[in-house]
Amino acid sequence: MRRVTRTIAAAGAAIACCITMTACSSPFGLPISGSVQTLAPVEQQAQRVYTNPQGPADDAQPETIVKGFYDAMPAGVQSDGYRVAREFLTGSASAGWNGDSAALVYSGTPDFRRRANTISAPQGAESSLIVEVELQVVGSLDSHGVYTPSNSTQTRRLPYTLMKKSGQWRISSLESGVVISTADFEQVFRQVSVYQVSTSGKQLIPDIRWLSWRNWRTQAVGEVLSDAPSWLEGVLRGAGLSTIKLAVDSVPVKNNVVEIHLNSGINALNEEERGLLVHRIRLTMGDGNAEYALRITGDGVDYSDADANVKLTTEQPTAGVYTLTGGHIVSLASSSPLRVGEAPGYDDARGFVFSSSGGAVLRADGVVECLKSDGASCGVMFSGEPMRSITEGLDGEVWAVSENGRELHVSDGGKETDLKLDWLGAADSIVALAVSPEGCRLALAVEGEDTNGVMMTGVARNGDKTLSGLSKAATQVSVLRHVTMLTFYNDLNLVYATTPPEGNSEQQEAWRQMAPGPANAQRLPNGTITSMASGQISLSRRLAIVDDLGIVRSVSGSLDGSWTIADSQVTALGAQ
């Protein structure tokens, strides 16, 4: 067999990568310390395309009426509050329909077909029939703006009952909620991070929602005051906000200042709780900007400065990228690769995490070996039990997936913790995992009978940020099968990829998304990718990959740019 040289690359801080047992040996190492940098909040779409739908034409056929309703729904979410969409409904149907209660997101072109209505037309109607719409649904939103992906290979049929009165067809019966195309989704829904406070009281968790552009501020305040989704239960600091509501169902902007008027419930909070609430609202309104200007009152009392002493920020630690090549540990953080340690004997390593304070390597036999800051061994972890993959956690943690894929193991400063996932099906197993930058979310690639795809669950922390447990629930963020590697590019965006059949790199898939949210295809360089990570390369934050020839490439910004080689000599540094 021809031997090829290759590298094992590693990325760091709270952003990690993992690979499966069968994947090639090119994992990234993850730094566990370093300076803190402020990441610019994700830029919200500034130039939206506003739609101007037309109402129903006289004598329009039933299919045309339903098509017109579909054309009008995006404007209802975005700007007109369903004024035009309701023109396609009968009066009683309009009164009972709530477009904001949910959303279905579809790809492709809907198919509109009529069929007979077996129920007699209601009194006063000249005729009645059903128009059935067949869709490729890729996801849905609930009333809180939480996104859940769907299997797009399965079609869904939505029935609309129409009646004819005075010679005109109108929709008389339909389910509440809207149906929006993937092309329109980000034009009509705004991504909003509802910032939650972890059980440690020292970390902020971005709880991603998708809210209608026309009144997103009002909805966002409501979500800050509402219960968190089930997958974060048990990992958030309780605040007792059930009695606090908006005094009026509106959040106006006056002289470029957002004004939020709450009822007297906020007065019952103590000073610390009130400060945290105001801070969470400020960060949520400002996309993570702690200096965002707003005015908050509670029953007429001005609390705009209540968070003046709250120090929680959305800043993330700088994440370096390291490679394990030919027995050397190399940092790619600066403009030129820098050798920082010696770790011989791991040419067939299957995983690697590292920082200036040390790390760990997943040996070819599955045993996780501790590394000192100079690369020297400091013993084995997890009692020498074989593991499937390892990844970096918070402040030096090493997370590992058991060989059977059923349990997680965490090493932190010599203390080891075993974790079980209550939501994992009996026939399911974990393939890979990544820990979010703040350390309070886990993304896991899962395969089995009950669950396939990428799941996300919460991580509970003590006051000193040490691990205390996991949420008992999880949320699905992708239904893509055979995911074997994943990493948080930043605190909002998750990137993941499959391992293709041997010798067929063209079948390898990679995706990125604000999680949970719609996924976008991630372009990969040529070759078969064996591992990925995120961190600082050549003085800027980048997504990095390593291919089956050991070449490390990286891309930055929107992740749609050109891939550049991070180290042109890696093919001579190690052997598989």
UniProtKB/Swiss-Prot annotation:
<protein>
    <recommendedName>
        <fullName>Lipoprotein LpqB</fullName>
    </recommendedName>
</protein>
<keyword id="KW-1003">Cell membrane</keyword>
<feature type="lipid moiety-binding region" description="N-palmitoyl cysteine">
    <location>
        <position position="17"/>
    </location>
</feature>
<dbReference type="Pfam" id="PF10647">
    <property type="entry name" value="Gmad1"/>
</dbReference>
<feature type="lipid moiety-binding region" description="S-diacylglycerol cysteine">
    <location>
        <position position="17"/>
    </location>
</feature>
<keyword id="KW-0472">Membrane</keyword>
<dbReference type="GO" id="GO:0005886">
    <property type="term" value="C:plasma membrane"/>
</dbReference>
<keyword id="KW-0564">Palmitate</keyword>
<keyword id="KW-0732">Signal</keyword>
<comment type="similarity">
    <text>Belongs to the LpqB lipoprotein family.</text>
</comment>
<dbReference type="InterPro" id="IPR018910">
    <property type="entry name" value="Lipoprotein_LpqB_C"/>
</dbReference>
<keyword id="KW-0449">Lipoprotein</keyword>
<dbReference type="InterPro" id="IPR023959">
    <property type="entry name" value="Lipoprotein_LpqB"/>
</dbReference>
<feature type="signal peptide">
    <location>
        <begin position="1"/>
        <end position="16"/>
    </location>
</feature>
